[in-house]
């Protein structure tokens, strides 16, 4: 079982450089087995061109390393907080992809300017606040997760599977590692489109609510009809 989990997480991680979402080692994917509570995550600081399935690190939700010769990603504590708080997710991605990270560094959420955005994410993609000095000094990675969880406590984390951390970068999630990667790719494209839209028309307004609703709910609503349902 753990070998299969490692293989899936390896394959998901290898999608990041394929889609241009990472430079050097600037990113990670994890996936959790909810039955055991174990998750696999990319090891810290290992180049993607040297990565192998057996290099994936198995962790539990208490932060204990169950299996692996390497240290886990430095963002592991953030992943743990999200898995503990968001029971309907099975995979998480963190990158420093340039367009999404540019929005994060600007401290801005990404407005929904069109249907590409609305097809996948309901509403503005949020940018959460900076951590305080105390939060950074106490437990930076854990408190990054705590901050994200706190932001989403009265929001639908399934309808909005992405967040920007101010001055840091994006996190996305999904039902498994591959879906979280898919959402990271979508986020990067949407971030690029939004930035270009504002360059072309600095006075642009968000897409009409009825259009955003139509595109999101035709794909994700109770009566969804986008794609094949069988």
What are these regions (language model features)?
Residues 1-230:
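Glycine-rich flexible loops
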